[in-house]
Structures are given as structure tokens and as C-alpha cells.
Amino acid sequence: MDVTIQHPWFKHALGPFYPSRLFDQFFGQGLFEYDLLPFLSSTISPYYRQTLLRTVLDSCISELMTHRWFVPHQPHAGNPENNPIKVRSDRDKFVIFLDVKHFSPEDLTVKVLEDFVEIHGKHNERQDDHGYISREFHRRYRLPSSVDQSALSCSLSADGMLTFSGPKVQSGLDAGHSERAIPVSQEEKPSSAPLF
């Protein structure tokens, strides 16, 4: 029995004019646009070429992501580890805004250890909409050397925004580095902190 052996390059070289056999029999991969529109296909094997639809989608997505109004998806704010944090260091003040809406002032401890402020929150298991949950987080921030550590303050607003702040001293003055706990005071009004 004579079997004609044809080099696969010969078939692909005539690709646009040569009809494909049952969509090239790539059953597990679905249809490619060159199966439906063979004049758009090239002579490269379908395993190595990128589909036209994929090329168009990639260019559209990259174009959308370059716009200033595009904001990537933020994780759910149920976990304090994922909450947005805002740290500001102006000429005369250092401020940290932290969303801790699931914690009461009794659940929070704020300490200053040398050049760092440590914020720790922990509450025992309690019931919420989905069952029982316990939460805990630990944050540590380096304080600028010019912050007056004797005048640090910390407050928790009614909407759960923790604000840690301290004034900066002029250069040449001692900032008073020591270890001490900062009490968390409860406010009755919502925070005026900027939205994230």
C-alpha cells in the first residue's frame, strides 16, 4: 500500500488557500479564529501563534489599565490586615490613619518602643452575620526622629477609624525617645480622615 508522505510545512504554506480538515482536529482546545476565517491565519503552527482575539483583548486590557481612573480591586475590608492605611508625615505633624471598625478601644493597645509605634488589636470570638469570628492584627511603624514622643496621642472615631498623631519638633531639640503606652480615647463623632 502506497502512502504519500507530505511535509506539514507544505500544507501550512498554503494555509489561507488550503481548507482545514475538521478544524485541524484540535478537539480539546475549542475553535480558533483561523478555523473560522482561514485567510487571517499565518503559516505558523497554531500551537505557537497567539490568537487574534487574545491579541485584541490583551491590547484593550492594557489600554484600560493605563488610565488614571482605573483602580485595581481592593481585598475585602473584613480583615484588618487588608484594610487601607494612610500614613502622613508633614513638616509639623506625623499621622497614621487605620481602619479598625471591628475593634473597641479595650481591644486595642498602642505602644511606643524607641523609634517605633506598635498597634495591636485582638478580640475574642464573637458572633457576626456569618457565624463566630475572632480577629487579631499587629502593625508596627517607624516614627520619624523629629516626632515629639512626649506629645503623642491616639483616638478612635465612632466609625472605627484609629488616628495616631504626634507633633514634630524643630531640629536640634531632643524628641524624648522612651518606651511608653499610649491610651486610646473614644470619640463620639465619625472620623474626618480622608477616604481611601
Curated annotation (Swiss-Prot):
Location of the protein in the cell: Cytoplasm; Nucleus
Name listed for the protein in its UniProt record: Alpha-crystallin A chain
Annotated stretches, region: Required for complex formation with BFSP1 and BFSP2: 1-63
CC annotations in GO: cytoplasm; nucleus
Subunit structure: Heteromer composed of three CRYAA and one CRYAB subunits. Inter-subunit bridging via zinc ions enhances stability, which is crucial as there is no protein turn over in the lens. Can also form homodimers and homotetramers (dimers of dimers) which serve as the building blocks of homooligomers. Within homooligomers, the zinc-binding motif is created from residues of 3 different molecules. His-123 and Glu-125 from one molecule are ligands of the zinc ion, and His-130 and His-177 residues from additional molecules complete the site with tetrahedral coordination geometry.
Post-translational changes noted in the entry: Acetylation at Lys-93 may increase chaperone activity.
List of glycosylated residues: S185
Pfam families membership: Crystallin, HSP20
Gene expressing this chain: CRYAA
Main subcellular location of this protein, as a coarse class: cytoplasm
Binding site for Zn(2+) 3: H177
Residues that coordinate or bind Zn(2+) 2: H130
Domain sHSP: 76-185
Assigned protein family: Belongs to the small heat shock protein (HSP20) family.
UniProt: Zn(2+) 1 binding residues: H123, E125
Function in brief: Contributes to the transparency and refractive index of the lens. Acts as a chaperone, preventing aggregation of various proteins under a wide range of stress conditions. Required for the correct formation of lens intermediate filaments as part of a complex composed of BFSP1, BFSP2 and CRYAA.
